[in-house]
């Protein structure tokens, strides 16, 4: 191409010229494979529905965040975070977590036509195809390899309001990732509709017009988004003809970063990189159709046009309702509402309910100038704030407990009651025999009115309480009358059946004799003799019965001068004082026999089937053969029987079965129908099931579009109330649906849009347009206002486009169009090349109403009419490129030059340097070019900074008055190439630049915010950290720094990023250390900063040393005295913790004395084995630090002896025996000494120590220390000298091994040593035990144990003193305070050594 023609082509591209792709689309064969045969799932055929949450096998990065699940929505989008049922697309950006990938967001209705398929794919064929596509469309990522693909396909779907014959669309979304980068590919096969017919979308019957589909990406934060060109405009019908990757109908994007990046051309074929034609922040997208380079501008919201150069007038659609005034802004509008209206578009009339908040679902109802809350069932109060307690009326019966619910209650019934109010059921009467009323081994039998006791031989009575008397048991000297009878003749003063009762002494029965045969009468504690002799008295005498002379319940009958006693049955005598036993009172007749007395005898009349004196002999039982079936009860008659059948059965032997309906199998009032061997239940309304056991449940009713539903349940009689959205009214009289007895809901209502135009509100022949919850008047020319009541200036609406000027006329206007535009509104761009103005073969290029002739070589001029080339003389020299135009030339200067003919040198800035480096920014500075002339030439500086991998690039312009700049929004830990150019701005929008001043720097990596200490000992600290896969992706090394105590020099260690833990050893015990972490990025030794800010220091204390040389100096039956070395100089301890452990429990004692070097443990049990441990406690500002415990094992002495055992650490057990002196010890000889003592020795006391290894040490009091050696033959005896000084002698005796022939094996001996792993056998009284080496446990030391560290919390007690005044004396009160301290605990894990050895041998 010739030079002039090349520049013309570039100029044409800058003006927005250049061919778009021809009508094409991606064939279905070029889609990623889909369909049920490929294993795809299909979304439900539901309006505005979707797939529900689909968990992902790998996280998917999107806008800088990772997502583990997604939703495939029927309306053409894939959403994260939550499902999106919005069917009318909303302009991006959108907040409220609307995180979406939109291939074609519109009102899809797959119920009418089409399917929505989706699947997650990781097979090799899909991954290979995705890898090839991404490497082709993003050549800067040649090493990309896909590991996961998700495919969603909307196949032949139609729009809401369409039918099976309406136009259909097919498009596809493909998500691809390798775990780090993520991409989206959109494939469009046919796009025949863009809009649904719902009123909010505004589409026509063909699915066109109104608010068209939205395509692009939205981060959900209200800020970040990306639109595919044509979104929400009629151009979406042509989306299958556009592309950014050279394939019409296919778009590819990278979407893992904070901003969407488009795929496309290389640097050599990119129009966007050369011209940058998009204005007002628009995103330039190369179309990259092979052989025809072109571009498309993705405009920010609020701008439109080929180059995003036109500001969208949001007021043109008259969004403000009810007379509101619209004010236009950039990508926005605002409405100034008239009085009585409110809302973003003045759509809502102000109501008293605007400031009334009804709680708990209450609905506000305006009444004149006030507002009232209509509460939901179960709530009351002015704002429905009070929950009604439905349990206050005690609705639950039969002991049921009531649970208050919202608008209802529930009864929890006790068995056997049930029902909504526990009203159904009855108590089961317990058997009277459950209390075992029969005594003395009697058998209880249930009866109709109670129970009957069958008594064993020798007992009788209702509960077998009375014993049958076979012999005479008369008491108090009574005499038995007759054989085998119970009649006793009692001596004077006693009465009763067995003469068991003593007659009470009274004044009249103590041998008192009245003269003349008079009778005695008690009177006032004395007696009175009533004589037979007549006496004349004038006053009344007391009655003879006043003294109550009759005993034992006898009744007194008074006569004139005497009385008689009428005795009760069983007594006789004048005063009823003599007992006559009732022979039948003892119940001698058994088995229901009737007792009758005859004189001094009784006779038993026996019932059927019994005989004998006492009816004790049974007759044959006719019921013994069990003739009654089905649980019938057999009753005896004289020679006969009768069956008492259970309910439902009949017949002589209860052999006839009841009807299937007998037991009332139908529940809840159902009517039972007998079907012979089966039954059928006719249920009451509201119940269903074979036995009417289930309530009718209609399920969840379907939603009604444009309506809000309130539901009080799904059982029969439940009601679903529907409230139409504003602007809609019910199509039927009822606004509710009722759950019917058949288990289905009644017919739903429909919300039909209200036609507010029926009242003809528009004046002056204005036409009314119905809106949702309102209307809009389209006024006739010359009128305006809410109701077209005002005459208007037609030019106020700015009807003239493309810079045309408006002239107002009565009821009309005229647009005076600028050159290049025609039409009523100057809307049509004139094809300036239609008249072929270019001469001499010049090529005409149209642009914005004007034309440009690209002249062949040798011609120039506006129409190529001049045959001369102003550039022939090379006016620009070698410093620029010459371009001829209209007989003149212009120079495009090369880098480093400027001026009309590029004669001035444009010098770069000097002394470029980095001032400060942060995680997301870099501050740089420079010096202006040297020389006054060089400084005056430039207009400013261009600062270009790009990441070293080429993933991002930005250029900022800096005024020439400044010499520093802050680069922002950089990625942490990345290397950036920074170039600063001197810039000279020209009038033709072509800028001249100098050579760059460049440098390479790297931002700081992100620090490690969280790291932890995993283990602490007396001389080591272990720390652990974690690097985030994305946030620390640029970190190459980690520096761990430690500041030692009393040292100002920080010691550091650097480790590779693969290392996540480090242990510092050789530390001092009980000291504080400060640990810091710093991340490093970039190669080592780089000259620019590569390290992050240091993390906050973590102060850690090492543990103090455990007490050293812990020993037991004295062990008794109930105590043990321990001693240990003082702590290391320079370490100040606060306390010690003494733990006493047995096989059953552990007791801990806190001793608040850090200088303690000994302690006596008391209250021990004799002859028991104990583990004693001592832990040192050091106090720090972080709390208390505990050392590892020092252990000591002891065995206390038995009470009848003073033997003691202990062992220290891993040493063998020792046993200390204190032996009393023998009664007489005249002489003690040692085997290796000579001579005899001069004087008889006194009885010495000695102690011997058995250490469990067949060695004995003995200590003698009052003897010199001499060694004893065991020899095969004894040597000459050596006498021991007896001295008065308390000197001691030690004898070390080597005991023979247990396998000696003369060793007797006892149950507690160690003759058979079963201790494993080096354990030492310790003999005992009844059995031996094993003293295990450290690291082993078990009865035979068969378990290998290790301590595993883990973080834990410890509860420590601390004794503090508080000064208290009492009177004039100050003293201290000690109080124990408990603290919780974070610590590292050790959990012991044991494993059998035999099992461990077996595993090692198997490996």
UniProtKB/Swiss-Prot annotation:
Compositional bias of kind Polar residues: 1305-1314
GO MF assignments: calcium ion binding; Notch binding
Location of region: Disordered: 1295-1314
Listed GO CC annotations: extracellular matrix; extracellular region
A Pfam family: EGF
Modifications after synthesis and translation: Phosphorylated on serine and threonine residues.
Annotated localization: Secreted, Extracellular space, Extracellular matrix
Signal peptide: 1-24
Alphabetical keyword list: Calcium, Disulfide bond, EGF-like domain, Extracellular matrix, Glycoprotein, Phosphoprotein, Repeat, Secreted, Signal, Sushi
UniProt GO BP: cell-matrix adhesion
Alphabetical list of SUPFAM superfamilies matching this protein: Complement control module/SCR domain, EGF/Laminin, Fibronectin type III, Growth factor receptor domain
Tissue expression from the record: Expressed in liver.
Entry-linked PROSITE patterns: ASX_HYDROXYL (PS00010), EGF_1 (PS00022), EGF_2 (PS01186), EGF_3 (PS50026), EGF_CA (PS01187), FN3 (PS50853), NIDO (PS51220), SUSHI (PS50923)
Occurrences of domain EGF-like (ranges): 268-309, 311-347, 349-385, 387-423, 429-465, 468-500, 541-577, 580-616, 619-655, 657-693, 753-789, 791-827, 829-865, 867-903, 1306-1342
Glycosylation sites per record: 292, 408, 484, 536, 712, 886, 977, 1015, 1109, 1139, 1298
Recorded superkingdom: Eukaryota
Fibronectin type-III domain residues: 908-1006, 1007-1105, 1106-1200
CDD domains named in the record: CCP, EGF_CA, FN3
Residue ranges of every copy of the Sushi domain listed in the record: 696-753
Residues covered by the NIDO domain: 103-258
S-S pairs: 272-284, 278-297, 299-308, 315-326, 320-335, 337-346, 353-364, 358-373, 375-384, 391-402, 396-411, 413-422, 433-444, 438-453, 455-464, 472-480, 474-488, 490-499, 545-556, 550-565, 567-576, 584-595, 589-604, 606-615, 623-634, 628-643, 645-654, 661-672, 666-681, 683-692, 698-739, 724-751, 757-768, 762-777, 779-788, 795-806, 800-815, 817-826, 833-844, 838-853, 855-864, 871-882, 876-891, 893-902, 1310-1321, 1315-1330, 1332-1341
Protein name (database record): Sushi, nidogen and EGF-like domain-containing protein 1
Annotated organism of origin: Rattus norvegicus
């Amino acid at each position: 191409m010739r030079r002039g023609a090349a520049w013309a082509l570039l100029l044409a591209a800058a003006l927005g010229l250049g061919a778009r792709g021809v009508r094409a689309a991606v064939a279905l064969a070029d889609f990623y494979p889909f369909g049920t045969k490929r294993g795809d799932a299909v979304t439900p055929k539901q309006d505005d529905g979707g797939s529900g949450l689909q968990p992902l096998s790998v996280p998917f990065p999107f806008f800088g965040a990772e997502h583990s699940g997604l939703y495939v929505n029927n309306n053409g989008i894939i959403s994260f975070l939550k499902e999106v049922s919005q069917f009318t697309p909303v302009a991006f950006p959108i907040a409220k977590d609307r995180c979406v990938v939109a291939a074609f967001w519109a009102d899809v209705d797959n119920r009418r036509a089409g399917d929505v398929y989706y699947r997650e794919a990781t097979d090799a064929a899909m991954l290979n195809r995705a890898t090839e596509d991404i490497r082709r469309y993003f050549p800067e990522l040649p090493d990309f390899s896909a590991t996961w693909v998700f495919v969603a396909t909307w196949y032949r779907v139609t729009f809401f309001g369409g039918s099976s014959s309406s136009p259909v669309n097919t498009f596809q979304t493909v998500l691809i990732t390798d775990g780090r980068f993520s991409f989206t590919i959109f494939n469009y096969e046919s796009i025949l509709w863009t809009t649904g017919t719902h009123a909010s979308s505004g589409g026509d019957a063909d699915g066109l017009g109104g608010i068209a589909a939205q395509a692009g990406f939205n981060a959900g934060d209200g800020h970040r988004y990306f639109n595919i060109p044509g979104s929400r405009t009629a151009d979406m019908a042509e989306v299958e003809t556009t592309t950014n990757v050279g394939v019409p109908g296919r778009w590819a994007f990278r979407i893992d970063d904070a901003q969407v990046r488009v795929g496309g051309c290389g640097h050599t074929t990119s129009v966007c990189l050369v011209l940058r034609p998009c204005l007002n922040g628009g995103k330039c997208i190369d179309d990259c159709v092979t052989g025809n380079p072109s571009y498309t501008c993705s405009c920010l919201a609020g701008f439109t046009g080929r180059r995003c150069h036109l500001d969208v007038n949001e007021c043109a659609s008259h969004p403000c309702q009810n007379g509101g005034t619209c004010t236009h802004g950039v990508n926005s509008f605002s409405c100034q509402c008239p009085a009585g209206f409110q809302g973003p578009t003045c759509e809502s009339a102000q109501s008293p309910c605007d400031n009334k908040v009804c709680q708990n679902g209450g609905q506000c109802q305006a009444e004149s100038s006030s507002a009232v809350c209509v509460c939901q069932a179960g709530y009351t109060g002015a704002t429905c704030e009070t929950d009604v307690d439905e349990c206050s009326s005690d609705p639950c019966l039969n002991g049921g407990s009531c649970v208050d619910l919202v608008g209802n209650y529930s009864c929890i019934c006790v068995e056997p009651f049930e029902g909504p109010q526990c009203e159904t059921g009855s108590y089961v009467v317990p058997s009277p025999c459950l209390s075992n009323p029969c005594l003395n081994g009697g058998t209880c039998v249930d009866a109709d009115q109670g129970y009957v006791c069958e008594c064993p031989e020798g007992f009788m009575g209702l509960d077998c309480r009375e014993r049958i008397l076979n012999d005479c048991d008369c008491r108090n000297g009574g005499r038995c009358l007759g054989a085998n009878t119970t009649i006793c003749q009692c001596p004077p003063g006693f009465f009763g059946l067995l003469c068991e009762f003593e007659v009470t002494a009274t004044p009249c029965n103590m041998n008192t004799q009245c003269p003349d045969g008079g009778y005695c009468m008690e009177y006032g504690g004395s007696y009175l003799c009533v004589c037979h002799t007549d006496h004349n008295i004038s006053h009344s005498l007391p009655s003879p019965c006043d003294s109550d002379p009759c005993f034992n319940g006898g009744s007194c009958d008074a006569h004139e001068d005497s009385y008689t006693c009428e005795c009760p049955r069983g007594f006789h005598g004048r005063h009823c004082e003599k007992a006559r036993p009732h022979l039948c009172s003892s119940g001698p007749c058994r088995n229901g026999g009737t007792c009758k007395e005859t004189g001094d005898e009784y006779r038993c009349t026996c019932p059927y089937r019994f005989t004998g004196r006492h009816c004790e002999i049974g007759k044959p039982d006719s019921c013994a053969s069990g003739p009654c079936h089905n649980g019938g009860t057999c009753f005896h008659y004289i020679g006969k029987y009768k069956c008492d059948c259970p309910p439902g059965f009949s017949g002589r032997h209860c052999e006839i079965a009841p009807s299937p309906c007998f037991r009332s199998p139908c529940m809840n009032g159902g009517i039972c129908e007998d079907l012979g061997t089966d039954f059928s239940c006719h249920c009451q309304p509201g119940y269903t099931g074979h036995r009417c056991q289930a309530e009718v449940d209609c399920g969840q009713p379907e939603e009604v579009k444009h309506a809000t539903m309130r539901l009080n349940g799904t059982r029969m009689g439940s009601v679903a109330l529907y409230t139409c959205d504003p602007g809609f009214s019910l199509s039927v009289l009822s606004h509710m649906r009722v759950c019917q007895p058949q288990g289905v809901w009644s017919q739903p209502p429909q919300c039909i849009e209200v036609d507010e135009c029926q009242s003809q509100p528009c004046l002056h022949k204005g036409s009314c347009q119905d809106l949702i919850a309102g209307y809009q008047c389209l006024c006739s020319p010359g009128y305006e206002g809410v109701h077209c009541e005002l005459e208007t200036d037609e030019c106020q609406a700015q009807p003239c486009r493309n810079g045309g000027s408006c002239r107002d006329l009565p009821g009309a206007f005229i647009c005076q169009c600028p050159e290049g535009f025609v039409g009523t509104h100057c809307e049509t761009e004139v094809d300036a090349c239609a008249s072929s103005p270019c001469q001499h073969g010049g090529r005409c290029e149209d642009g914005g109403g004007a034309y440009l002739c690209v002249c062949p070589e040798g011609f120039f001029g506006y129409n190529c009419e001049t045959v001369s080339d102003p550039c022939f003389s090379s006016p620009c020299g070698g410093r620029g490129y010459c371009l001829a135009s209209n007989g003149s030339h212009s120079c495009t200067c090369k880098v480093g030059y400027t001026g009309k003919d590029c004669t001035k040198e444009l010098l770069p800035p000097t002394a470029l340097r980095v001032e400060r480096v942060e995680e997301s920014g870099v501050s740089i500075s420079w010096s202006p070019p040297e020389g006054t002339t060089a400084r005056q030439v430039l207009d400013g500086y261009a600062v270009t900074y790009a990441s070293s991998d080429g993933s991002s690039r930005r250029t900022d312009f800096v005024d020439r008055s400044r010499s520093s700049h802050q680069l922002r929004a950089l990625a942490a830990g990345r290397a950036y190439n920074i170039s600063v150019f001197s810039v000279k701005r020209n009038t033709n929008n072509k800028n001249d630049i100098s050579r760059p001043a460049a440098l390479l720097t790297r931002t700081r990596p992100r620090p490690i915010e969280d790291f932890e200490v995993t283990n602490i000992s007396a001389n080591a600290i272990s720390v652990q950290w974690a690097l985030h896969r994305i946030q620390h992706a640029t970190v190459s090394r980690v520096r761990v720094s430690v500041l030692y105590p009393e040292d100002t020099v920080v010691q550091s260690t650097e480790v590779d990023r693969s290392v996540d833990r480090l242990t510092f050893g050789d530390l001092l015990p009980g000291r504080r250390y400060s640990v810091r972490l710093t991340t490093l990025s970039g190669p080592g030794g780089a000259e620019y900063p590569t390290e992050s800010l240091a993390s906050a220091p973590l102060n850690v204390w090492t543990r103090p040393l455990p007490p050293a040389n812990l020993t037991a100096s004295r062990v008794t039956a109930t105590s043990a005295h321990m001693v240990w070395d003082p702590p290391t100089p320079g370490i100040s301890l606060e306390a010690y913790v003494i733990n006493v452990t047995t096989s059953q429990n552990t007791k801990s004692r806190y001793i608040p004395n850090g200088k303690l070097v000994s302690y006596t443990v008391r209250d021990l049990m004799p002859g028991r084995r104990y583990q004693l441990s001592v832990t040192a406690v050091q106090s720090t500002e972080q709390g208390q630090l505990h050392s590892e415990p020092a252990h000591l094992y002891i065995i206390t002495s038995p009470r009848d002896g003073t033997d003691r055992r202990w062992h220290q650490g891993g040493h063998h057990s020792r046993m200390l025996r204190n032996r009393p002196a023998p009664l007489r010890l005249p002489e003690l000889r040692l085997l290796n000494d000579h001579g005899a003592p001069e004087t008889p020795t006194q009885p010495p006391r000695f102690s011997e120590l058995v250490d469990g290894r067949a060695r004995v040490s003995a200590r003698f009091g009052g003897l010199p220390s001499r060694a004893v050696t065991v020899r095969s033959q004894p040597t000459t005896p050596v006498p021991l000298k007896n001295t008065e000084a308390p000197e001691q002698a030690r004898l070390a005796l080597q005991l023979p091994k247990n396998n000696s022939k003369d060793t007797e094996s006892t149950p507690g001996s160690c003759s058979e040593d079963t201790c494993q792993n080096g354990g030492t056998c310790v003999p005992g009284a009844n059995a031996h035990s094993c003293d295990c080496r450290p690291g082993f446990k078990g009865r035979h030391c068969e378990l290998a144990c290790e301590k595993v560290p883990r973080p834990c919390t410890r509860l420590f007690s601390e004794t503090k003193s508080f000064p208290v005044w009492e009177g004039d004396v100050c003293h201290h009160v000690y109080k124990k305070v408990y603290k919780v301290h974070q610590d590292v605990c050790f959990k012991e894990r044991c494993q059998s050594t035999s099992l461990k050895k077996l595993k090692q041998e198997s490996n």
